[in-house]
């Protein structure tokens, strides 16, 4: 008799521990959705700079093939919006295509 009570009690304890409640899963999913919304809201920005203007972020550069670039002037790093990627016309065309793809998949407005 005592053995059967111990077996039943052990089975109930295992069942309670093994199967978490449905409420805790819902709370966990809500937190994930909230984090995803915050990330999307923080990344979208509008452009305000033209080619050659100094910038801090890629989203500040306006244009479908314009991206932020880094050049060195007198050993000092300067970040600016640029369109041209090479002096070679073929490589420059490929570079503009890559810039277009990069801007297409960014969250910039």
UniProtKB/Swiss-Prot annotation:
<dbReference type="GO" id="GO:0090729">
    <property type="term" value="F:toxin activity"/>
</dbReference>
<feature type="signal peptide">
    <location>
        <begin position="1"/>
        <end position="18"/>
    </location>
</feature>
<feature type="disulfide bond">
    <location>
        <begin position="47"/>
        <end position="62"/>
    </location>
</feature>
<feature type="disulfide bond">
    <location>
        <begin position="59"/>
        <end position="108"/>
    </location>
</feature>
<keyword id="KW-1015">Disulfide bond</keyword>
<keyword id="KW-0800">Toxin</keyword>
<keyword id="KW-0964">Secreted</keyword>
<dbReference type="GO" id="GO:0005576">
    <property type="term" value="C:extracellular region"/>
</dbReference>
<comment type="function">
    <text>Putative ion channel inhibitor.</text>
</comment>
<keyword id="KW-0732">Signal</keyword>
<dbReference type="GO" id="GO:0099106">
    <property type="term" value="F:ion channel regulator activity"/>
</dbReference>
<keyword id="KW-0960">Knottin</keyword>
<feature type="propeptide">
    <location>
        <begin position="19"/>
        <end position="46"/>
    </location>
</feature>
<protein>
    <recommendedName>
        <fullName>Hainantoxin-XVIII-2</fullName>
    </recommendedName>
</protein>
<feature type="disulfide bond">
    <location>
        <begin position="61"/>
        <end position="81"/>
    </location>
</feature>
<keyword id="KW-0872">Ion channel impairing toxin</keyword>
<comment type="similarity">
    <text>Belongs to the neurotoxin 25 family. F7 subfamily.</text>
</comment>
């Amino acid at each position: 008799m005592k053995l059967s009570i111990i077996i039943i009690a052990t089975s109930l304890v295992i069942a309670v521990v093994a199967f978490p409640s449905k409420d805790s899963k819902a709370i966990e999913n809500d937190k994930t959705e909230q984090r995803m919304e915050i990330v999307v809201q923080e990344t979208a920005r509008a452009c305000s700079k033209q080619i050659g203007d100094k910038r801090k972020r890629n989203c500040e550069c306006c244009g479908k093939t314009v991206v932020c670039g880094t050049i060195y002037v007198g050993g000092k790093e300067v970040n600016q919006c640029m369109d041209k990627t090479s002096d070679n016309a073929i490589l420059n065309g490929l570079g503009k295509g890559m810039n277009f793809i990069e801007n297409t998949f960014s969250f910039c407005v």
